[in-house]
Amino acid sequence: TGKTSLCNILAGVLGLTNTDAGKRFTEINVENGWTSYKDYVGYYNPLAKTYEKANTSVYDAMHMLSKESRESTNIPPYVFLLDEANLSPIEHYWSPFLRACDIFQEDGVTFSLGGTEKWHLPNRVRFLATVNFDHTTETLSHRFLDRSWVITLDPDFIDSDLERVNIAEEFASEYAFSSNRLFQ
C-alpha cells in the first residue's frame, strides 16, 4: 500500500535523508522473534568487554544521538522508521521508548545496553512505524495504540494514486526543507 514509501518521502521532504547535511533518518527492518531493543541495537558483551552491534546503522545512529545529547542542547530532529513493526510484539522490543510516551520527558529517554554506559536519546527523536494486519503479524495492544497516531491507508492507494506518489518522490529529492534551518 505504500506505507514505507510514504515514510521515506516524508523524511526526504523534511530534509532528513540529505546526506550533504548529514542523514537524520534510519530505517529499521523489524524481524520476527525480537524480544528486546538489544535485538536491533546491540548489547554489551561482558566477556569481551565490548559492545556488540546487532544492526550497525541503528547502533551508530543511537550512539551518535547519545553523544550529541551530552554535548549540545541544540540537536536537529532524527526519525527512525520501524518497517513491518508488528512482526514481533512492539510492547516487548520497544519498551524503553514506549515507556517514554507514558510521561513527558523534556530531556528524552535514557537506556542501557548493559555494562556501565548509559545511552540517551534526546526528545527531538521521533519514531514512525509501518504495520500490517494479517495472519503473519502480532496484534497491536491498547497500550500501544493509546500512545500512537494511526493513519490507515486504502489497500488500493498505490494503484489509484501512483502518479501523485511519483511526483511526491521527485519533490522529496529536491530537499524542499532542511532540518538544519530549524536552528538558524
Model-identified regions with their sequence ranges:
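Basic, amphipathic alpha-helical bundle interface domains used for macromolecular binding and assembly
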Residues: 183-184
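AAA+ P-loop NTPase catalytic core and its hallmark functional loops
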Residues: 1-177
